[in-house]
Amino acid sequence: MAENERTFTAPQSLLDSNLTFLNDEPTPTTITLTRERCVDPSLINSFLRILRHGSDDVIRQKLNNYRKPSSISEKKCDAFLKQELYPNWQIRSSIISFCDQEATQMKAETDRKFSNTGSSATGTITDARIDPYAAREKLEDQEARYRDWTRVKEWVANNEKIEQILTSTTDRILRQNCEQNKNYLEQFAQFCKDNT
């Protein structure tokens, strides 16, 4: 089966010079996702950390200039939302969705490969007579595949929860600093529909 691959680039507004981490490593600005990266998400986690730092972690600082209620502040808030925050949230959501789709495919492929119906069950008996370790190797392969699937599903669930917490906290901060009566999470959902 052909490998799925998708590339994401961090929004330019996040790549400012004050974004440095310990170890002085260069900041990754682009990531190409594959199934292997979903199974071992260390690079994805680093990329998500950069995205989260550039928006949700520093939102109060970015909105400090917009505290006074006026039409100028509201326009600045809208510009910040549409040019920085919502694209950032959309990238993060797409990354998590990609790995979720890969997990679904992994489960379906593993279930298909190891179903005990038809000729594959007979083949296992024949293989067991020829190679006494074949059944054990098949079981180990099956367990490893399900372990990878479980790891990806847990990572997806974990990151969906993190995103839920971050977006609801950011929504609350936006209501305090921009427009109190707007539902920013609904606006984000509409932004995603308009930009897919």
Q: Which residues make up each language-model segment?
A:
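Non-coiled-coil alpha-helical tracts in long, low-complexity regions of eukaryotic assembly proteins
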Residues: 2-131, 140, 184, 189-196
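Charged, alpha-helical coiled-coil and adjacent rod-like segments in eukaryotic scaffold subunits
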Residues: 123-196
